[in-house]
């Protein structure tokens, strides 16, 4: 995933989180807000793993989002990874993230 599609600054994350719109399952929480372009930020709490482990799971999540090709959706998103995400295999992660994003797409088509 290219840098132009990432949320980087703390205040960017705060703006999305303050919007309070989210979708959750037992693996991730996805906060979102309407924006002019697609951007995503990924967080893993410190207590789940050391820095190497946290970066590993962030890379996996970036790969899943890149594979799903969500770049034409005008939303900013913050994805918070839960403990269950860390303990499952990659195939389960892909399936569960695809489910949550199809749920997100259906929910936002109703709004339009």
Curated annotation (Swiss-Prot):
GO terms for molecular function: 3'-tRNA processing endoribonuclease activity; ribonuclease P activity; tRNA binding. It holds the Pfam family Ribonuclease_P. Keywords: Endonuclease, Hydrolase, Nuclease, RNA-binding, tRNA processing. GO terms for biological process: tRNA 5'-leader removal. It is an enzyme of class 3 (hydrolase). GO terms for cellular component: ribonuclease P complex. It catalyses: Endonucleolytic cleavage of RNA, removing 5'-extranucleotides from tRNA precursor. SUPFAM superfamilies: Ribosomal protein S5 domain 2-like (SSF54211). Its EC number is 3.1.26.5. HAMAP family: RNase_P. Consists of a catalytic RNA component (M1 or rnpB) and a protein subunit. Belongs to the RnpA family. RNaseP catalyzes the removal of the 5'-leader sequence from pre-tRNA to produce the mature 5'-terminus. It can also cleave other RNA substrates such as 4.5S RNA. The protein component plays an auxiliary but essential role in vivo by binding to the 5'-leader sequence and broadening the substrate specificity of the ribozyme. PANTHER family: RIBONUCLEASE P PROTEIN COMPONENT. This is Ribonuclease P protein component. It comes from Mycoplasmopsis synoviae (strain 53) (Mycoplasma synoviae). The lineage of its organism: Bacteria, Bacillati, Mycoplasmatota, Mycoplasmoidales, Metamycoplasmataceae.
């Amino acid at each position: 995933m290219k840098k132009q599609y990432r949320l980087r600054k703390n205040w960017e994350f705060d703006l999305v989180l303050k919007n309070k719109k989210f979708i959750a399952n037992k693996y991730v929480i996805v906060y979102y807000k309407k924006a002019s372009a697609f951007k995503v930020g990924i967080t893993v709490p410190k207590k789940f793993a050391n820095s190497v482990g946290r970066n590993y799971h962030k890379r996996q999540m970036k790969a899943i989002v890149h594979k799903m090709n969500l770049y034409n959706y005008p939303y900013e998103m913050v994805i918070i990874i839960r403990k269950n995400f860390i303990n499952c295999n990659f195939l389960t992660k892909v399936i569960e993230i695809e489910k949550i994003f199809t749920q997100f797409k259906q929910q936002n088509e109703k709004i339009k």
